[in-house]
Regions:
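Glycine-rich phosphate/dinucleotide-binding loop and adjoining beta-alpha-beta core of small-molecule
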Residues: 2-4, 44-131
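Positively charged, low-complexity intrinsically disordered leader regions
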Residues: 1-46
Length: 131
């Protein structure tokens, strides 16, 4: 397995977007689909998912994953900074998630009071290559 630096990953994303006629949001959807399929295959016995999203493109991945997992029957909660300035792609996927209408989207502050049940998967979509 080759391990890439954050800069190399950004360059790979930009190369793919530029040379494959794939938009950034489409690339994000592909990544979310791959993550969703991995979760379904590997942690199918857990149906509760909490996703923590930042405000960059990694958050956009998290919002897309939340939407996809919900459509597969998982119980999903999303925690994010509701007053954040989201990246363009993250804002688009947050809008799509809100339009779905049946997923709890909570501010980070609620995480301190939340009771995380046993057998709940927690997904980190806070930090990406921009960290």
């Amino acid at each position: 397995m080759k391990i890439l630096t954050a800069q190399q990953i950004r360059e790979c994303d930009q190369y793919t977007i530029k040379n494959s006629s794939v938009s950034s949001i489409s690339l994000m959807e592909r990544a979310a689909e791959a993550c969703t399929e991995w979760i379904i295959k590997n942690i199918y016995h857990i149906n509760k998912i909490n996703i923590f999203c930042g405000n960059g493109n990694n958050a956009g991945d998290g919002f897309a994953i939340a939407r996809m997992l919900k459509s597969k029957g998982f119980y999903v909660k999303v925690f994010t900074n509701m007053s954040a300035n989201f990246s363009t792609e993250a804002a688009k996927n947050l809008k799509r998630l809100r339009e779905k209408g049946d997923i709890e989207i909570l501010d980070y502050e609620k995480a301190f009071d939340a009771k995380f049940e046993e057998n709940t998967c927690i997904i980190d979509a806070l930090f990406g290559t921009g960290l």
